[in-house]
Amino acid sequence: MDKKPLNTLISATGLWMSRTGTIHKIKHHEVSRSKIYIEMACGDHLVVNNSRSSRTARALRHHKYRKTCKRCRVSDEDLNKFLTKANEDQTSVKVKVVSAPTRTKKAMPKSVARAPKPLENTEAAQAQPSGSKFSPAIPVSTQESVSVPASVSTSISSISTGATASALVKGNTNPITSMSAPVQASAPALTKSQTDRLEVLLNPKDEISLNSGKPFRELESELLSRRKKDLQQIYAEERENYLGKLEREITRFFVDRGFLEIKSPILIPLEYIERMGIDNDTELSKQIFRVDKNFCLRPMLAPNLYNYLRKLDRALPDPIKIFEIGPCYRKESDGKEHLEEFTMLNFCQMGSGCTRENLESIITDFLNHLGIDFKIVGDSCMVYGDTLDVMHGDLELSSAVVGPIPLDREWGIDKPWIGAGFGLERLLKVKHDFKNIKRAARSESYYNGISTNL
């Protein structure tokens, strides 16, 4: 389908989309050779290029927006027209009106009025037996002056016939008066864009059904009011970001249990990736954010922790216990449960006491501390071989390993060890019952799971 220019799109909807995703009502606009002069209902004026590929043109074609201008007072009718793709996709049908051949009429004096045609067979109609079909008499002049579309005429005929028959069975001599009053039309069904907008505003604690039949604007207004109150309450009381708060809570948990906190570089040599067994033929290699031919953003915390274990083994007593919390980066294609920028927790212990039982005990204490249900199942992965997966339902929270493993030799490690890695965003998703992991991530669109596009 051809991309329509901006003037065609705003003429079809009567609306304007700002750079911030705000819908405005257009009061007046003029189109020159390459420019459009627009006056909004709120009083704002602007001059824009009549482009097919501008941000506003794309937004109008995709029928998406963030909010409406309060001063423009965009009506529900205008909003539904904008959100319904039919106004752009429907093909128009040209109707050719053909007039009937005119008959020559005799001229009549202006002073003489045309008398209505008398009803025919009135007496015969009144004398009909009760078993015959009832047909209310309609003046011929009325029949000639009222034009009804065929579809409407058919439905009216079927309704009146059914009502007439029902009334005659019940003995009602005036079946027209027995017809019930028309039923009030319910609110139109929500479009996909409207549903997506409301789901962004919904929180797990909201007991609001999107199938309640309420108009979109009423549902949106109620949810916007709730989200603003939620943000105001956070600003007045807690003032803590969920991700930062969880990081501090985890840090305190492991420090209290004798683990040393590590903060290692985010930019690492590509050589580390190769030493982890990730070559160019593996799937994980395609997910690496390469900075240049020598460095990349770390996709995991393990390489730096391997180096710390080897170096600290020369100075610290047995066993060595360390942990790190920090951002990692991968080019992920599945956005439902994965993020390209995510926060990892890795903890490991090297030396004595590195058994599966001890590893499961640390994991159990940790998740019980956070109040998260889980189960541990066996699995395997490309990097570490056999692993223990920590699951919450169908969601993987962690992969845990009991060493030594063959990969250790690449990093100069020759002692037994245990360790596990957790994604903090997944822990928050489970802890707060978020439907979308992006609500728990570093984001400008959400704060503590609350949409900021208000």
UniProtKB/Swiss-Prot annotation:
Residues 123-133 have a biased composition (Polar residues). It catalyses: tRNA(Pyl) + L-pyrrolysine + ATP = L-pyrrolysyl-tRNA(Pyl) + AMP + diphosphate. Transmembrane segments: none annotated. The keyword Kinase does not apply. Its main location: cytoplasm. It holds the Pfam family tRNA-synt_2d. Keywords: Aminoacyl-tRNA synthetase, ATP-binding, Cytoplasm, Ligase, Nucleotide-binding, Protein biosynthesis. It is found in: Cytoplasm. One of its GO terms (molecular function) is pyrrolysyl-tRNA synthetase activity. GO terms for cellular component: cytoplasm. Belongs to the class-II aminoacyl-tRNA synthetase family. Catalyzes the attachment of pyrrolysine to tRNA(Pyl). Pyrrolysine is a lysine derivative encoded by the termination codon UAG. This is Pyrrolysine--tRNA ligase. It comes from Methanosarcina mazei (strain ATCC BAA-159 / DSM 3647 / Goe1 / Go1 / JCM 11833 / OCM 88) (Methanosarcina frisia). The gene is pylS.
